[in-house]
Swiss-Prot record:
This is Transcription factor SOX-5. The gene is SOX5. Residues 77-89, 102-111, 120-129 have a biased composition (Polar residues). InterPro entries: HMG_box_dom (IPR009071), HMG_box_dom_sf (IPR036910), SOX/SOX-like_TF (IPR051356). Residues 1-29, 77-141, 359-426, 714-763 are annotated as: Disordered. The keyword Nucleus applies. The keyword Ubl conjugation does not apply. CDD domains: HMG-box_EGL13-like. Forms homodimers and heterodimers with SOX6. Keywords: Activator, Coiled coil, Differentiation, DNA-binding, Intellectual disability, Nucleus, Phosphoprotein, Transcription, Transcription regulation. It comes from Homo sapiens (Human).
Amino acid sequence: MLTDPDLPQEFERMSSKRPASPYGEADGEVAMVTSRQKVEEEESDGLPAFHLPLHVSFPNKPHSEEFQPVSLLTQETCGHRTPTSQHNTMEVDGNKVMSSFAPHNSSTSPQKAEEGGRQSGESLSSTALGTPERRKGSLADVVDTLKQRKMEELIKNEPEETPSIEKLLSKDWKDKLLAMGSGNFGEIKGTPESLAEKERQLMGMINQLTSLREQLLAAHDEQKKLAASQIEKQRQQMELAKQQQEQIARQQQQLLQQQHKINLLQQQIQVQGQLPPLMIPVFPPDQRTLAAAAQQGFLLPPGFSYKAGCSDPYPVQLIPTTMAAAAAATPGLGPLQLQQLYAAQLAAMQVSPGGKLPGIPQGNLGAAVSPTSIHTDKSTNSPPPKSKDEVAQPLNLSAKPKTSDGKSPTSPTSPHMPALRINSGAGPLKASVPAALASPSARVSTIGYLNDHDAVTKAIQEARQMKEQLRREQQVLDGKVAVVNSLGLNNCRTEKEKTTLESLTQQLAVKQNEEGKFSHAMMDFNLSGDSDGSAGVSESRIYRESRGRGSNEPHIKRPMNAFMVWAKDERRKILQAFPDMHNSNISKILGSRWKAMTNLEKQPYYEEQARLSKQHLEKYPDYKYKPRPKRTCLVDGKKLRIGEYKAIMRNRRQEMRQYFNVGQQAQIPIATAGVVYPGAIAMAGMPSPHLPSEHSSVSSSPEPGMPVIQSTYGVKGEEPHIKEEIQAEDINGEIYDEYDEEEDDPDVDYGSDSENHIAGQAN
């Protein structure tokens, strides 16, 4: 029965129709393919065999026990049936066995499958005829086999590739089934290792997922932080922009306020510029005085420095603005219009800061009155001239705190132009002027006499008396001036000379106190001291009085610096080549040359400077430099050259001689002797707040058109250093920034000595 050639084919067909697991695992299929290959090989060798997928480890299991009755049943049936029936029964039994144990062959190797097939073949061959009770079970097995085939057909129709999750589940199912079917777990190879590997894989996956989750959370947190920081930055930027906008708004508001203030100031300036800067009297004048003063063009602005003119009728050019100049040059303006101008100017002055002090317009007598009617000498003892001097002179508030007062030694018959000296504080002046005007002598004022012929005549007589007195005093002073000149005040080198000079100074001071001409401390002539205005004393002494020097202390010159040492000779050379060159131009030339020089070229002059400084320190150990304030001088609104100024001085002296010789009443102003200074009205910043009504010997010209200019009379009697002190600043009104001109060489003189000698000998 076993040698029937049909059996191998039948078994081959049965084995090829092995039921697969419902999950279609790959291992079972591989095992079946391997068993088929072996069967074919054996058939080719002529050794047919039965290969049933029976596991080796099943004999002790219930399945194997069930298998034995089945095999016995198949043997019995085979014994009682015909070969055909036996063959069919074997086929059914084989299918049953295959279907029963097919799941157990999935995890076994091909060798185990082959062994199982051989054992099954042997068991089948060794089985005898089974009992009838077993047939029902075999029929059930056949039914199961048919069901298995249908399932296989369904599985074959499904896709060969199943999802990876099904593969994993199928492996797990196989492992569990093998573990259940086999009591010996140790015989299952790879089970602990696979579990450990899977556990490791699971742990790795868990770790990866955890790390990925952490990364995602960290990235999410970073994004949140970044978004929060961006929001914060945006908020800060918005706040900053808001602050900037607020600041810009505040700045714009401030700019608008400043612009508004500027506009207001410009409007005020325009209003003031349209009005002529008129001279406002300290006390209210009458309309006739205003009209007379305005018609003559004598309109002096309070903040404008008076600089006398030089034209033939001697018009006083006092108005810096075009409006005022037009008003001065237009005599056709009616008194009412001029009064309105004055009133407007007065209102502007009252509104303006207190630094602008109104001055007193000097009246003009016109053709009806002689020009000598409105000036008195303040050096006389009579009170009325003092009051007239106080009110007859316009105030000059822009001048530097220096005085131009001095004596007129060569004009004993000439009246004196009073130069008001006002302290830098404006309050004391305002307080002193009304006090002076309230006195009985103040009522005899210039403006009060403008249209009063009797008063004018009286003033003329007083002026003549003062001239006579000045003539007598000048004759006495001529000798003293010569002595002072011979001593050489600037170049005293011996103690004897200094002692003589100091004694002479004391004598002059005593003379001054006796005559009572200079009772005001502000006008203390400490070196000259003569009430008649001695020409031999430099007016710079008066200026230095405000710097706190003692009454008997002589002026100590500063030691020359390197530039002064070098410029001394260079200046003389330039003047020799260009006698008419202005000192400002000379200083510019010298300054540019000095800057262009190298240090090696300057070295000798620096050495000379050191030597002079050492010598000066040894001679004057207590010396302290006290700079005097700078000032500029303009004549007719412009700076004059030396030649032009000398020509003007010559004309003044010639006309003065004519007036003295002919005995005319017209008074020509005389400047302080020893000070070649064209400005007759100057402000001196003196410590005393009182008006210098008692000690001004400068002649005052009653005629508004008369140029008030200081001459060079009596310069012969003055010492050389006086010339050098005044030549740079007073003659030309020029102040050098390079050095103090008064420290120049005493021999340098920009004015001609011949003119000074002639002026000194004129009377």
